Curated annotation (Swiss-Prot):
It comes from Mesomycoplasma hyopneumoniae (strain 232). This is Lon protease. PANTHER family: ATP DEPENDENT LON PROTEASE FAMILY MEMBER. It holds the Pfam family AAA. Keywords: ATP-binding, Cytoplasm, Hydrolase, Nucleotide-binding, Protease, Serine protease, Stress response. One of its GO terms (molecular function) is sequence-specific DNA binding. The gene is lon. Belongs to the peptidase S16 family. NCBIfam families: lon (TIGR00763). The active site is at residues 777, 820. ATP-dependent serine protease that mediates the selective degradation of mutant and abnormal proteins as well as certain short-lived regulatory proteins. Required for cellular homeostasis and for survival from DNA damage and developmental changes induced by stress. Degrades polypeptides processively to yield small peptide fragments that are 5 to 10 amino acids long. Binds to DNA in a double-stranded, site-specific manner. Residues 691-870 form the Lon proteolytic domain. The lineage of its organism: Bacteria, Bacillati, Mycoplasmatota, Mycoplasmoidales, Metamycoplasmataceae. GO terms for biological process: cellular response to heat; protein quality control for misfolded or incompletely synthesized proteins.
Amino acid sequence: MPTNSYRFLVASEDIYFQNTLQQSITFSDPESIKVLKDFYHSNSRPTLTNKDFLIVYRKEKEKDTKKKNSSVIKFPRNDFNSFEDSKNDIQNQAKILNGKVGDFENSLLPRIYDLDELSKYASLARIQSYRAKTSPDKSEWQTVILDFIVTEKVQLVELINDPQNPKVGQIIIKPVRETIKSPEIHINLINDLLEMARKAKNFRIPTELLLIVDKFGANSEYSTNEYIKGVTNTLSCSPSLTYPQKYQLFSYNSYPAKIKKLYEHIHTFAEQIKLEDEINVILKTNLDKQQTEFILKEKIKAIRKKLGEDSRYEDEIEELLHSELGKKVFPKEVAKTIMRETNKLKSMIVTSPESNITKSYLDLLVALPWKKVKKDILDIKNVREKLEEAHYGLDEIKKRIIEYLAALIHRRSQSEGKPELEKVGSDYIDSNLFLSHKIRKVRSNSIPILTLVGPPGTGKTSIAMAVAEAIGKEFVKISLGGIRDEAEIRGHRRTYVGALPGKIIQALKKVGVSNPLILLDEIDKMGADFKGDPSAAMLEVLDPEQNRFFQDHYLELEYDLSQVLFVATANEIYDIPEPLLDRVEIIELSSYTFIEKIQIAKSHLIPAVLKENALDPKYFPIQDQTIDFLIRHYTREAGVRGLKRVIDKIVRKIIVKLLEKTLDQNFVIDIEFVRELLGIEKYDPDNVDSSPQIGTVTGLGYSPLGGSTLQIEVSTIPGRGDIKLTGSLKDVMQESARIALSYVQSKAKDFGINFDFENTLIHIHVPEGAIPKDGPSAGITFATAIISALSQKPVSHNIAMTGEITLRGKVLAIGGLKEKTMGAYKNGIKIIFIPKANEKNLVDIPQEVKDVIQFIPVDTYQQIYDFIFK
């Protein structure tokens, strides 16, 4: 065996590469003990002292957890003083002193096949002493501790087998010369390196370094070169450095290169400390700020407690927010806003104005229903029964509403993927509300808005209430009449003093659910001024594609109105803004007939009034004839509000007579009794003549109060050939009269009229001059009255007519035929001329009216002339 070959130890990063101070390794596994014994007996005098061995280092490879324990010797990751403390920990002890050649089954020893597995440089070590702990019978070693020093850095040359034991390998080495002298290195540089290492608090300095520094200071024989080597090599073995960093420093053969690289490593640690210090300063600043805020908040709490106030309000809100119901009801964005405002309120002085504003805002956020809904009653039979019970007549209207609700019920029951309402306690939660991805569902689930158009008192509001009751919805009414400020709908911004949310949000807060029926009353009576146009704000509310994201200025959060059933009412369809009209579905309600009013009075009004006044029905014996008298002579309306007031007045007067005991025991409410209680009749039938008159013809009119008759009078006076119009006629009606006169003049010969138009003034008057009148539908009535006056032929008082006339005598369609017909019916008209184009509207006329009145559809005026004057 060559003299420069050595047994070797495969080391890990815990071996000090060039540390000249004494180190220790503990062995306790049987195989390592066996190898040590062979090493012990390798000379004539058995010993381990002063024997040399190599410490070799494996090359860095990818980690293989399966071979980790068999390929790398494990040492404690700390300095040499800790080896003795860890000798009882098998995993932290050295496994083998000799490397073995070959591959042996069940071997825990490192397997070294050639030098390519090892790093180029190794450490030559000498055993200084050893301590062996033997078995009780002194025959076997159990634990061996080797004390050694690294004597030299060497280069590996060849791996060879031991002839005596082929299983054991040895390595041939050669010395390595390391240069140290350089003008770049002097004692001050080493001292600076030591100072930087001390300041880098995260860089661990081996304790051996103190011995080297002390030795150099106390022993003048300890040369500068030895000092430089000792400091450099000891710092290079710092536990703070990684194994690759340690070996890289070990591999340099020039101490200037080692010191330069070591300086870079320590400088990196110093920069890390600097960065950590900066971060700590920032953290301390933030912590100081938080502590200051905490102290101030605690002081505020103490002050509030001293003033008799506490934080129960904020605690109650937080408790609600974290409750099971709160987690389900409040959307995430709303919950964040509530928490933010609650924290803001905690830091405020209670008496400050801002505190009151924030508290009012929090009250609204907590009071709104958000995802809370009321479960609908999806029963079409129940809807029909409720409407029949609540209203008499209005069959067509009931059909429209039932069809509408049936479609709604069917759509909801057949909707795919919609989960059932979640019940939390006694409340229902709709998880489909306030979803971010619901835009794509809008068109398939959009519901048109119902708008009931009709005269006052015809039951628009009561129908809406009946619908809400029928499908189990909460009902709330919003009166829009006279609203001129857009903020009434969208709310005021919180920056304004006395700011409030809009009527929509207030209504939802009032009912406490997000799926009520909201009645928008008098939608046709909204106005606009310099404060904005509220009808424009209503566009967002009534548009199913927008109301899912309705924003109130006060709330400043989106509110989902998609589950609200809106029902609007109006008296006149022409007064509804066109953009709004485009978003709603119109259902028209017309005047009640006399028979309907009588039945309504008997079935609804009289029982309701008697109940309100706690009067026994036996004290209100009334017949249909008397009710009809009340309707005709004490009311003039399309609905029944006035009739209810008249009945209520009669009931009160009967109660007075009961208390005064002046009421006959067998009295009956007849026409004379009514006159006694109410006085003379307030209304007579419209001024319809009782006999045919020359120059007077009955026309038909329509107003928000319903239909009525109007007399058109024509007389001739000597004068210039001209026309005079009186009776508060507006432009369209004046033009209609002039067109009728021009038509009659052009057809005078055909009508047998021989009249001096150039020297005669024709005066046309429509009575009740205080009432403005407009519209083209009196055209044929003007023509008939003019012909009657010029030809001196009377027209029957039982005939009425409505229709626009052209210069060629064509009769054009008109609107409001049903209401006009009801006005004629109330005044005893028997024959009505209507435009042929309106014949299709006769289906809307009640049968009881058609049984009394004859309708004659005409295309041209000639047909009317032939019927009346020939």
